[in-house]
């Protein structure tokens, strides 16, 4: 049998022939269709190539940001500065870290993956959800391209906010809180997520960004444990919370056992829940009898009786500074260790 008439057209990409389109038929008749098919295939290849380039660029940018906040910069600062310039960031600009926890974001993404039964579409939906959050954040900084935003895993995102070193500490802090509130409100309104934010301090040199990130993470973790989610916490406002973060859990447990818990192996309380709540209200009202009584809606004499009971049970006298500090620390530790009763 003889060869059938037809045409073969080369498929080109980046000035290289990577394939051939073959169409059977009279050349004069099929040639126009061949050109259309050739053009369509080459356009599809170009789109796929550009998509991969964009994905690679995003991945390169994310890798750089993660190295920056984790302090993995290698032994050559100049090389790291060059990496930053390649992805569009001047990391010599002073910045402070804001770490955001988006309540149940990870749970939402897991549910999305399960809904798609682990298919490729589920992963695409997950990436789209992350990108939506980042676009919402980046939309706030549309006029300031040197602000850095990234997803860091779990429920968390980070913003590395540029700052003006001419600002006083007070002015800088107010600006950061205003920016944090704007981010929190925007995400809450547009995406219906509850957001908690931790803010770090400014530190010099390129390694200072990772220090600020760690502080912002600590502010977020400690603030959420002690005061609850949905607020903004600065590392310098943690008070004794910063100290608690440095004390081992076992040491905290031992301290509570000597003050408000009776035995080592369980949490049967020396003082009951009512007394603990009364004690917390007393501290929250700066040891004011009248304000505390008003806050918890009890008579002054009832409050005084409860405070005497605390002394009788624990052996600690709230009129003595050292004893009051011990009880205050024990209550803070109780909340920090996971009790949500007082939040």
Language-model segment annotations:
Residues 25-83:
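Juxtadomain coupling helices with adjacent low-complexity linkers
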Residues 79-97, 101-343:
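Cytosolic nucleotide-utilizing catalytic cores of signal-transduction proteins
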Residues 3, 16-19, 195-197, 236:
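Generic detector of intrinsically disordered, low-complexity, polar/charged segments
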Residues 19-28, 162-165, 200:
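Short beta-strand-to-loop transition segments that serve as allosteric relay/switch motifs
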Residues 16-19, 25-30, 93, 144-146:
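N-terminal functional module of multi-domain proteins
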Residues 1-12, 19-22:
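A short beta-strand signature within small-molecule sensing/ligand-binding domains used
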């Amino acid at each position: 049998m003889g060869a059938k008439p037809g045409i073969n057209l080369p498929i080109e990409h980046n000035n290289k022939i990577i394939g051939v389109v073959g169409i059977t038929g009279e050349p004069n008749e099929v040639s126009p269709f061949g050109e259309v098919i050739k053009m369509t295939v080459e356009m599809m290849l170009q789109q796929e190539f550009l998509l991969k380039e964009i994905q690679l660029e995003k991945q390169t940018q994310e890798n750089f940001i993660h190295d920056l906040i984790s302090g993995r910069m290698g032994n050559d600062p100049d090389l790291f500065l060059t990496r930053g310039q390649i992805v569009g960031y001047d990391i010599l600009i002073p910045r402070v870290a804001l770490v955001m926890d988006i309540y149940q974001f990870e749970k939402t993404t897991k549910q999305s993956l399960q809904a798609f039964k682990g298919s490729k579409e589920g992963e695409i939906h997950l990436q789209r959800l992350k990108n939506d959050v980042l676009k919402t954040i980046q939309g706030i900084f549309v006029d300031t391209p040197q602000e850095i935003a990234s997803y860091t895993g779990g429920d968390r995102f980070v913003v590395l906010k540029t700052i003006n070193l001419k600002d006083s500490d007070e002015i800088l802090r107010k600006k950061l809180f205003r920016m944090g509130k704007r981010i929190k409100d925007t995400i809450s309104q547009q995406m219906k997520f509850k957001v908690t934010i931790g803010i770090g301090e400014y530190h010099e040199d390129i390694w200072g960004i990772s220090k600020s990130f760690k502080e912002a993470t600590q502010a977020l973790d400690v603030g959420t444990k002690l005061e609850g989610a949905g607020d903004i916490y600065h590392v310098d406002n943690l008070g004794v919370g910063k100290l608690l973060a440095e004390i081992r859990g076992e040491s905290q447990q031992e301290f509570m056992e000597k003050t408000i818990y009776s035995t080592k192996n369980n949490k049967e309380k020396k003082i009951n829940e009512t007394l603990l709540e009364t004690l917390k209200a007393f501290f929250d009202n700066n040891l004011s009898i009248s304000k505390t009584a008003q806050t918890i809606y009890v008579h002054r004499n009832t409050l005084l009786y409860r405070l005497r009971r605390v002394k009788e049970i624990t052996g600690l006298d709230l009129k003595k500074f050292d004893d009051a500090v011990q009880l205050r620390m024990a209550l803070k530790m109780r909340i920090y260790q996971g009790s949500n009763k007082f939040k």
